[in-house]
Amino acid sequence: MTPEFFPENINVISTKRYNQEKPKVFSNGFDSFNIADHVGDDPERVSGNRKKLVQYLNLTSEPRYLNQIHSDKCLRFSSIECEGDALYTNKKNEVCAILTADCLPIFITDTLGQEAAVIHAGWRGILQGVIEETLKSFVSKKLVAHFGPAISKENFQVGSEVRDQYLSKDKSFNSAFKTISSKNYLDLYHAARLILNRHDIYKISGGTQCTFRQKDEYFSYRRDGKYSGRMANLIWIG
């Protein structure tokens, strides 16, 4: 798919929790199209799912996956490092991938379609600056963004210490929180939008899905706990 505002040569996809070739069977989070190999699922099934993804998308190369650590690290596709939470490329057919269940996947490209990146933006990563660090990788300053599926504010309760950390970093994050009966709820979409806007990125699509609420479509760690699989979020330059 090509999101709104994105050049036609930029390819973006977020997988769902089921393989459309099979019935939806949800006795646990792993009886479906899980792409993560670190959550306790059968390694052979995960490997098979990854191969099906490559075949379905007719990719010429394997996606590059990271060992995600909720950090601010953005790696170039060619980097020998394996730990990080964002991938950047400026070459064709280098498929950058991050895995999510509730965290926010952010896709970024320039208006000419010569650079691309995908970010794993959970509350920790956003707080640590993973979005800002990824933007530093881009040569172009004319950028657009797309939000993949993440947990919605209504279903993402966080502790008061999380809110305090955000407000200590920037008071404007107050608008990303809602407090109901002394309970704090964080809007990841809004928090990310604030950061992107501060870097003159206003053309942003997506941000309407909820991984927690849309059980038939998405994995959710907050909803399913340790039996939650992960969706793959891919971007590449065609």
What is each residue range found by the language model?
Residues M1-G238:
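Active-site microenvironment for binding and transforming phosphate-containing groups
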